[in-house]
From Swiss-Prot:
Membrane topology: Peripheral membrane protein
HAMAP family associated with the record: Cytb6_f_plastocyanin
Function, in words: Participates in electron transfer between P700 and the cytochrome b6-f complex in photosystem I.
Name assigned to this protein: Plastocyanin
Location(s), subcellular: Cellular thylakoid membrane
Transport as UniProt keyword: yes
Binding site for Cu cation: H73, C110, H113, M118
Taxonomy of the source species: Bacteria, Bacillati, Cyanobacteriota, Cyanophyceae, Synechococcales
Cofactor requirements of the protein: Cu(2+)
Cofactor binding annotation: The crystal structure with reduced Cu(1+) has also been determined.
Family: Belongs to the plastocyanin family.
Keywords: Copper, Electron transport, Membrane, Metal-binding, Signal, Thylakoid, Transport
Gene name for this UniProt entry: petE
Major location category of this protein: membrane
Entry-linked SUPFAM superfamilies: Cupredoxins
Length: 125
């Protein structure tokens, strides 16, 4: 009987130690840092499109739009003037950025080329 009680006590101590070790691992894990995701304005094949046209990011991430082809381009985020960049980018490699803090789905477009289908979507988790 003493052997069984001793075994049960050791098993419970081991279980408590395991829970503490695993729990401390999760508490000490570093939070994910914010990322920057690039979107090309003007597809590599010369089409008037954002590349990629749809992205998924986390709240706090930054989107960087890079002027790629067939300038001029800009970015207007529907209903979000603070995230928009209405000035036209003329030079290849010219960039502008916006940080998305709130979860949601954001539709954006290039003002001069919206009619040609230059529209994109950002899904913020």
């Amino acid at each position: 009987m003493k052997v069984l009680a001793s075994f049960a006590r050791r098993l419970s101590l081991f279980a408590v130690a395991a829970v503490l070790c695993v729990g401390s691992f999760f508490l000490s894990a570093a939070p994910a840092s914010a990322q920057t995701v690039a979107i090309k304005m003007g597809a590599d094949n010369g089409m008037l499109a954002f590349e990629p046209s749809t992205i998924e990011i986390q709240a706090g991430d930054t989107v960087q739009w890079v002027n790629n082809k067939l300038a001029p381009h800009n970015v207007v985020v529907e209903g979000q003037p603070e995230l928009s960049h209405k000035d036209l980018a003329f030079s290849p490699g010219e960039t502008f950025e916006a940080t998305f803090s709130e979860p949601g789905t954001y539709t954006y477009y290039c003002e001069p080329h919206r009619g040609a289908g230059m529209v994109g979507k950002i899904v913020v988790q």
